[in-house]
């Protein structure tokens, strides 16, 4: 009787192992069989809550922009394209724009003296690994006009970002596991913009 129980238990374990390996092979075949299609989404400042653009200064040094990433997407690339204008009177060798994604530094751009007073575009590549379901992109202005003492209220310290500035996010779809706890995803995702 004991031998029959051992045999039944061994067969039960083997069938479970065979089912798991068959499912794993099916998932791998599905992943390898389909090419990952990258989806690109571009949001301008108006769509991210800044319809009039943003003016950063020595007092108001940063702005937060929010974007949602769907549960069934993986961010593969991100680019911030800022349409900016800043005055000529500041020290451009000591003035920067820093970009944080979810409170992690992702990019820095020094302000150019050659482009001061002229509207132009600053492109900053962002680290896609820093993006999560709700992503906060913080743009911080660090400007100075004097190497010794700086008055943060000085009108020379300003950076104007136009509303046509954009955040472009490239993503690939992810296969979600069959779990009712994820509902209403993927049919409805509150992070859709």
Each language-model region and where it sits:
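Sec-dependent signal peptide recognition
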Residues: 2-7
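Extracellular/secretory-pathway and virion-surface proteins
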Residues: 18-193
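Hydrophobic h-region of N-terminal signal peptides that target proteins for export
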Residues: 9-17
């Amino acid at each position: 009787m004991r031998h029959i129980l051992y045999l039944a238990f061994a067969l039960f374990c083997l069938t479970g192992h065979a089912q798991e390996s068959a499912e794993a092979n099916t998932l791998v075949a599905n992943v390898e069989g389909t090419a990952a299609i990258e989806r690109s989404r571009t949001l301008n400042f108006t769509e991210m809550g800044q319809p009039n653009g943003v003016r950063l200064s020595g007092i108001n040094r940063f702005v937060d922009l929010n974007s949602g990433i769907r549960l069934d997407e993986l961010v593969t690339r991100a680019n911030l394209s800022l349409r900016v204008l800043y005055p000529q009177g500041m020290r451009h060798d000591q003035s920067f724009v820093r970009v944080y994604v979810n409170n992690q530094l992702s990019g820095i751009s020094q302000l150019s003296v050659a482009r001061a007073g002229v509207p132009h575009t600053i492109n900053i590549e962002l680290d896609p690994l820093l993006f999560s379901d709700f992503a906060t992109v913080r743009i911080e202005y660090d400007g100075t006009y004097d190497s010794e003492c700086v008055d943060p209220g000085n009108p020379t310290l300003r950076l104007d970002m136009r509303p046509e500035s954009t955040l472009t996010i490239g993503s690939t779809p992810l296969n979600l596991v069959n779990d009712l706890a994820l509902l209403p995803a993927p049919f409805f995702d509150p992070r859709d913009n």
